[in-house]
Each structure stands twice: as C-alpha cells, then as structure tokens.
C-alpha cells in the first residue's frame, strides 16, 4: 500500500496511457489499491443488463480507476506538471509547494 501523492479535487495531468497529456480533476482516491479516479480519463464501455433502476440497459461509458503513478500534479501558476515538496509555514501548518515555481498548491 503506497502513499498516494494526490488528493480529491486536485488538478492532475495524465503522464502515460491512452489519455496522456489530458489535464483533469481527481474525483476519488483509493489509497489501499493506490488508484485514483480522474474525470474524463480512462473511460471504459460497460455493458449493463436491464434492471429496476435502469430499465433500458445497454452500453454505458464511465471512468475507471487508474494507478496513481500515471498522474502528476498540475500547477495552475506555471501551467505544467510538477513534483511537490512539503513546507512548514510559520504558523505550524504543512503545505504542498510546487517544485518549479514555489507556489503553494
């Protein structure tokens, strides 16, 4: 169980796979499996049988979780994928800082 470096609602860029280069938002984080669910990335088609909730059934497109190593945090200040460092502020709070521009994320 690896520590996941992104949080829910973070902006990330996909760095490998069929959606490489796509900038999107993290919808969910699964730390036990080290996976993240990214909006409009890794979209799969699922064949759904008709049931009470979905009378029609059919083919549904939805996002599937991807490994957290395939995404990188996106800094909106320098408009690029970046690594992060942790910094301790004077009031004692820990913040994440962009390695490229030094902006607090």
Curated annotation (Swiss-Prot):
Biological-process GO terms, alphabetical: translation
GO cellular component: ribonucleoprotein complex; ribosome
Any one Pfam family match given in the protein's UniProt record, by short name: KOW
Lineage of the organism: Bacteria, Bacillati, Bacillota, Clostridia, Eubacteriales
Protein name: Large ribosomal subunit protein uL24
UniProt xrefs under PANTHER family: MITOCHONDRIAL RIBOSOMAL PROTEIN L24
Chain's role: One of two assembly initiator proteins, it binds directly to the 5'-end of the 23S rRNA, where it nucleates assembly of the 50S subunit.
InterPro entries associated with the record: KOW (IPR005824), Rib_uL2_dom2 (IPR014722), Ribosomal_uL24 (IPR003256), Ribosomal_uL24_KOW (IPR041988), Translation_prot_SH3-like_sf (IPR008991)
The gene coding this protein: rplX
Family statement: Belongs to the universal ribosomal protein uL24 family.
GO MF annotations, alphabetized: rRNA binding; structural constituent of ribosome
Tree of life domain: Bacteria
Record's subunit section: Part of the 50S ribosomal subunit.
Record's keyword terms, sorted: Ribonucleoprotein, Ribosomal protein, RNA-binding, rRNA-binding
């Amino acid at each position: 169980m690896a520590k996941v470096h992104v949080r829910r609602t973070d902006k990330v860029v996909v760095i490998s796979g069929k959606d490489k280069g796509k900038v999107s938002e993290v919808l969910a984080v699964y730390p036990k499996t080290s996976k993240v669910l990214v909006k409009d990335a890794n979209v799969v088609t699922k064949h759904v049988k008709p049931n009470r909730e979905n009378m029609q059934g059919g083919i549904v497109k939805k996002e599937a979780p991807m490994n957290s190593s395939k995404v990188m945090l996106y800094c909106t200040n320098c408009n690029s994928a970046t690594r992060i460092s942790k910094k301790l502020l004077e009031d004692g709070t820990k913040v994440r800082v962009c390695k490229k521009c030094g902006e607090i994320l």
